[in-house]
Regions:
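Conserved beta-strand-loop surface patch within small alpha/beta domains used
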Residues: 1-72, 83-139
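Histidine-centered divalent metal-coordination motifs
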Residues: 77-81
Length: 139
């Protein structure tokens, strides 16, 4: 289960709406399973159908996470025209060529903008190509 403070879910939805019609992406970091920082990451694809995180952003974020002794807890992105469920592309991007997970402990948070007046947000694990929905508790 992932527990997420309301202001983080609000920020994810706001980010998605601001980037619409393109997908947004970002990272949640923290300690002991508790999110303490949300990082918006530039989607270098500038696409409504896919995202790729800017490598320069990732270098800065990874350094700050290491310096703060945090963990990468979740990766988030939006789906602008489909449900909040990992696509085949999302699964492929979450795995190495040998099929093993790149971040097996990380949650993947997806926000769907199919209904922009009421976006849907869900959390998943993607482990070795298998998707499992996880409870997302907003506090």
């Amino acid at each position: 289960m992932l527990e997420l403070e309301q202001h983080y879910t609000d920020e994810i939805v706001t980010h998605a709406l601001e980037e619409d019609p393109n997908e947004c992406c970002g990272i949640l970091a923290g300690q002991d399973g508790r999110v303490t920082r949300l990082y918006r990451v530039t989607n270098v694809e500038h696409s409504p159908y896919r995202y790729s995180m800017d490598p320069k952003d990732l270098l800065v974020i990874n350094q700050e996470i290491d310096d703060s002794r945090w963990e990468l807890l979740a990766i988030y992105h939006s789906h602008t025209h489909t449900e909040a469920y990992p696509s085949a592309t999302d699964v492929r991007m979450a795995t190495w060529p040998d099929g093993k997970s790149i971040w097996p402990e990380a949650y993947y948070i997806l926000v769907s903008l199919m209904d922009k007046s009421s976006p849907t947000i869900r959390a998943f694990h993607i482990e070795d190509g298998t998707i499992s929905e996880e409870e997302l508790r907003i506090v």
